[in-house]
Amino acid sequence: GEAKALINGYRADLIYTEPTEYLFYNGDYWEESKQLPVAVMEDFLDKQLADAEKQIEDSYNLLMSLGVQESDLMLTPKKRTDAMNGEAQLEALQKYEAANTYKNFVMRTRNMKYINSTLQAAVPMVLHKISELDHDPYLINTPDGTYDLRTGQGRANSKDDFITKQTNAIPSDIGKQIWLDALNTFFLADKELIDYVQKVVGLAAIGCVLSEILVIAYGDGRNGKSTFWNTIAHVLGIYSGAISADSLTVGCKRNVKPELAELKGKRLVIAAELEE
């Protein structure tokens, strides 16, 4: 019952998949988190407590208006019932007692054991397939809207897109000339190379593999390699990620599966430069 009540109030904000567990819609994208669903449950319990206290207040005021003495409410349940004079007082007392029972129930549920069990019981009601998340590889989510990379058209962010990531930047021409000057510095004004890198970055913004590319930024130190790629990674926000360079080598002997699992849904992954 409590799990259904929770989902009735928060169905639009919570989903669950087996690999990710709970995700919460934060207004911009679906955020994977163990703590946010707990916060949702705590907010739900706070609302229930406020509702119970309001019912107690309303039913108490009704009893007083019907002439019931406050001392009568301090009696044992049977004596309290016997003290009521007429059907109206009895009905008001039943409402008052039900409201107190409701509040006592809510107070008993305000602990982590109950919160976790309620969230677990709610799973079947908000269960989704992992394939539903980020299902359109051509959509990219930004702070001011979601853009279709095929058309360049933007629209308001929507929870129905099931997007789990967001960029740090919005489409804008602000600072464009500074960036163009930086590119000419990084790539020695080589237009063909700049055009190629632009294509690579464009491919990286798309959420599916159109071309299998491992880019190796080679060159002496302090020539802009890290500055360029770190800038792109910053723009892409949580669409980008990092990986240890040794995990890409054949001779890596440690377990890299957890590290690789963290890359799910990333569109650009950067490894620090190797020693050789």
Task: Label every PLM stretch briefly.
Residues 14-35, 132-135, 146-267:
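P-loop NTPase catalytic core of nucleic-acid-dependent motor ATPases
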Residues 35-42, 46, 105-115, 173-176, ...:
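Generic detection of long, well-ordered alpha-helical segments
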Residues 1-166:
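Intein modules and their embedded homing endonuclease domains
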Residues 266-276:
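Conserved AAA+/SF3 P-loop NTPase catalytic/coupling segment centered on the Walker-B
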Residues 103-114, 120-123, 179-184, 230-238, ...:
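Generic detector of short, locally flexible boundary/turn motifs and exposed helical patches
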